[in-house]
């Protein structure tokens, strides 16, 4: 049985970033995607930290959760790179299909990047528009076609891994997540934010699951309150780094700024401390520092147990026994088209 769709490469990828195959469609321009070193690591994000910072204004982190024996259950989380003075669309981290072209300023990107974003959002109209414009080039068959095929094939490979309907899909599906739920009669009822989340493409749903940690984590019957308030929301515009009333102080460091246009003048108003701080450093330098940035926390997560082993890797299928809250969520989620001939999922080893 062929597990690879026509037009998709079956070779094992060494770059797990969805932007890793970016090449200019102009054969006279030499450019390779400047992915960070984590692109070679299959960590389940399917985007490297460089492009996560550049396009989605987030940075990868790990949230360690300790038990009484100092063992760690590590889950992924991201901190957002939006300053507390930013307003409006600048606070949107992951936009929806309705506004992604405006939020990402797609017309300012090269055609290869535009094509990848349109593939992520499954905007076939824009994909066909780009293909039609490329076909008008007299060198399309000789030079451009092979580049377009390479970009398209590599992108489809990544998207197939995050498609819940794909055979042997690797999206996170062994847990229950609510981002905007209300508790009614001891049951979680999905809100508007969960509807927006469920309407997003598979790649973005996986990205949000990786980046946003729950305020409350339930492992079997154990409730862990990680935070008592959210640091982001999901609304009709997408995943937004905002809180009620005053925004959280979030200084953006110079190392977090991706300088794509070094010759462009930029003016930033920043807070700076001056004076002799060495005395304080000598006195307090021995203690552990509290990091002054804003990680993303929102909603509730239920992690199931299998064979009494907590799965740090969430690629395995859920066993059974979903709480009643899940039925409420599925009832409000749009129905997905049923596959023509569903194949049984192969047994996966417990990690």
From Swiss-Prot:
Q: What is its main location?
A: virion
Keyword annotations for this protein, in alphabetical order, are:
Capsid protein, Late protein, Virion
Q: In which compartments does the protein localize?
A: Virion
Superkingdom, according to UniProt?
Viruses
Q: Does the keyword Ribonucleoprotein apply?
A: no
An example Gene Ontology cellular component term from the record? viral capsid
Name a GO molecular-function annotation: structural molecule activity
Q: Which Pfam families match?
A: Baculo_VP39
Q: Which cysteine residues pair off into disulfide bonds?
A: none
InterPro entries the record matches: Baculo_VP39
Family membership, please give it.
Belongs to the baculoviridae p39 family.
What is the additional note? Expressed late in infection.
The name on file for this protein is: Major capsid protein
């Amino acid at each position: 049985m062929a597990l690879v769709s026509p037009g998709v490469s079956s070779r094992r990828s060494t770059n797990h970033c969805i932007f890793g195959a970016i090449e200019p469609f102009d054969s006279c321009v030499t450019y390779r995607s400047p992915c960070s070193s984590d692109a070679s690591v299959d960590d389940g994000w399917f985007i490297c930290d460089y492009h996560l910072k550049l396009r989605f204004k987030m940075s990868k982190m790990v949230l360690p959760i300790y038990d009484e024996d100092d063992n760690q259950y590590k889950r992924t989380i991201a901190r957002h790179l939006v300053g507390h003075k930013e307003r409006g669309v600048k606070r949107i981290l992951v936009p929806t299909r309705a506004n992604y072209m405006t939020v990402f300023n797609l017309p300012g990107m090269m055609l290869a990047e535009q094509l990848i974003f349109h593939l992520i959002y499954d905007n076939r109209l824009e994909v066909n528009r780009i293909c039609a414009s490329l076909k008008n080039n007299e060198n399309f068959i000789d030079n451009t076609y092979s580049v377009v095929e390479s970009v398209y094939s590599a992108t489809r490979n990544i998207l197939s891994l995050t498609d819940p309907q794909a055979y042997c899909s690797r999206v996170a599906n062994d847990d229950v997540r609510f981002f905007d739920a209300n508790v009614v009669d001891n049951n979680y009822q999905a809100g508007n934010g969960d509807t927006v989340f469920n309407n997003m493409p598979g790649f973005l749903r996986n990205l949000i699951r990786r980046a946003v940690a729950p305020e409350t984590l339930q492992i079997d019957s154990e409730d862990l309150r990680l935070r008592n308030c959210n640091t982001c929301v999901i609304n009709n515009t997408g995943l937004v780094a905002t809180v009620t009333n005053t925004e959280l102080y979030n200084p953006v460091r110079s190392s977090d700024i991706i300088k794509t246009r070094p010759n462009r003048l930029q003016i930033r108003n920043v807070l700076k401390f001056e004076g002799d701080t060495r005395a304080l450093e000598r006195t307090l330098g021995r203690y552990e520092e509290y990091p002054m940035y804003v990680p993303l926390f929102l909603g509730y997560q239920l992690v199931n147990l299998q064979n009494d082993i907590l799965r740090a890797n969430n690629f395995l299928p859920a066993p059974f026994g979903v709480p009643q809250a899940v039925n409420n969520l599925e009832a409000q989620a749009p129905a997905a088209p049923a596959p023509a001939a569903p194949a049984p999922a192969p047994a996966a080893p417990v990690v």
